[in-house]
């Protein structure tokens, strides 16, 4: 966010993500981001509020943050040697107006050796990340390439968010 503006505050919403449903993983990311932004905007109506949510789409199956080591291993094994999509929903709320969009990036993973997977899930890195990996961390070793926004994979599509902010200025 600091790339977009130096003046921001992070506020966590109280949205129950389990109650949000959508017809596609991309729509889910957008719906979650919208719900989060709208919840915070209700508490801070005079402010410009941005909400984000990222999901990993592996052949139509949604991967959020892993619950435990077994869940992280399941996700990473599914991603190994495959191309998947990372969808980040972005919603802006300001002065009673709102707009939402979604950014999608294709990520190509090389096959991952089982010992590397097991070592990785013993670190703290995968547990607060959709899809159980941090592209800017050790998982960069498995990334054969991307198509789209790199920052989207980290959960904040900088260009798309900056566009929305300019539109609402």
Positions of the model-derived regions?
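Anionic-ligand binding patches
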Residues: 23-169
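A short small-residue
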Residues: 12-20, 140-142
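N-terminal G-site helix/loop of the GST-like fold
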Residues: 1-11, 168-169
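Short, conserved active-site loops that position catalytic residues or coordinate cofactors/metal ions
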Residues: 10-15, 51-54
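Short, glycine/acidic-enriched capping/hinge loops at junctions between secondary-structure elements
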Residues: 2, 21-22
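A short linear boundary/processing microfeature
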Residues: 7, 16-17, 82, 123
